[in-house]
Amino acid sequence: MSVRCGIGYDLHRLAEGRKLIIGGIEIPFDKGPVGHSDGDVVAHALCDALLGAAGLGDIGTHFPDTDPKWKGANSLLFLEHARKLLDEKHFVIEHVDAVVILERPKLGPHFPKMREALAKSLRLPPEKIHLKAKTNEGVDAVGRGEAIAAQVVATLSL
């Protein structure tokens, strides 16, 4: 058995009047990410982590922001596509560990639904997905509430 790890990162500016989609679910808030798709930083970073671990490129290769068909797209579609590519190469997703970095809102109460949405898209048991949230304690664009970021590590076996 071969084990591979991939790392993903994503960051989006936040703007008023946009939906806040994180981990595949909408979270009530007055701001949301500015992006070509729905701006789901967890799904984007997770997609990059999975593709990177498998040596299959990155989210921009598969879903370029220059392609109008991805405008406003649900980022869970990106995860479903990544899962199909992994299946074709016989990779197994062993574990996903994600951290979302934002000042507000508090995400802990939303983790169960986020985990369910991500697990469903990847066809995984929810216990293979771990989520955490951190703040930047007022430092930089994330700390000032101007942006949201996520970092994800994915472990695959072959």
Language model segments and positions:
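Pyridoxal 5′-phosphate
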Residues: 131-135
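C-terminal edge-of-domain segments
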Residues: 142-158
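Short acidic capping loops at alpha-helix termini that bridge into adjacent secondary structure
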Residues: 125-128
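Acidic (Asp/Glu) carboxylate-rich active-site/surface patches
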Residues: 109-110, 140, 144
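N-terminal charge/polar-biased segments
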Residues: 1-3, 157-158
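A generic structural signal for short coil/turn motifs at secondary-structure boundaries
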Residues: 30-31, 139-141
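RNase III-family endoribonuclease catalytic core
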Residues: 2-113, 117, 122
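Glycine-rich, charged/polar anion/phosphate-binding loops
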Residues: 6-8, 137-140
